[in-house]
């Protein structure tokens, strides 16, 4: 922390609390904390069978940054200094009543927030299929793996059924989905859960990895049949 500015790493501070579960209606209510505004923005695009409540942006200058940004800050003292100075400058603007209502309420997409979700199991099953895939961003991936584990811990047995879509199709879905353009679909290398068919990737790494999820949340992600077969053959 510097100048009262707090910066948190990736999904280390991510929290998921199951508030209620109704096995008859198959409705779940859960609270998400320690996540950035950009993750809420991505999550709240879901529309069917889901409701978002009590969205609250931190009044304190608390930010959650991508792991790669955090690691860069740790390696580059000058970059870290500039980040804190920029955030402190933004806080001065937010607290200056003479800047006008538009600027005083401005939130960077990395500012910490919390919210509550009410969702039916059909909607959640669809979201899990997409968001458990490591080609998604670390915040949304971490949230859904953590939620899955919390449901299992609460004895909600059907959570064991939740798996990434690529485990259902038994092939890498990245770079070929209809909603991805060819340009966007080759940004990152495949995660290795299934054999990748992409010939080129701008970044020689997956967008998110099971190792990152394990390191920052303590959750061991289940492995695919492909990965287990590879382990047997080694």
Regions found by a protein language model. Give the residues of each.
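Family-specific signature for flavin-dependent thymidylate synthase
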Residues: 1-234
